[in-house]
Amino acid sequence: MPFAVQEKSTFPGQHSAMAKLLIVEDDESVRTLAARALERAGHMIDIAADGAQGLALIRAARGGYDLVVSDIRMPEMDGIQMAKAAAALFPAMKILLMTGYADQRERAEELNGVIVDVVQKPFTLAEVRARVEQALACFV
């Protein structure tokens, strides 16, 4: 069941509607900073500390996230495994991956169609906001 989209005032370059996002990141400081930055941009945020928690939230929401923003390299279940499982359950699911490792970016290429982009770490909060806005704009 899709959620209701609420319009809000925007500044230039900002996505015009609030989106429901899931941030999956094992580093608590990165997870918290990204969540705050995206909340300030007007989005509703859920967070998970690893891919297993992320997949559980995706299942509970019945795939109802506009975008999942996930680290690739995490304990328990990594972002690639989570993306594959989420795509099998919800083929329309779109995921933006983050990584600090060049070799992990290559692993993401096998998920074309599910992965909308890979953000290289470290990144600024402005960069992550801009990449999320670009990813969301692709689906408007």
Where on the chain are the PLM-derived regions?
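Active-site beta3 strand of CheY-like receiver
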Residues: 63-69
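Receiver (REC) domain active-site loop signature in two-component systems and cognate sites
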Residues: 74
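Acidic catalytic/metal-coordinating carboxylates
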Residues: 50-53, 78-82
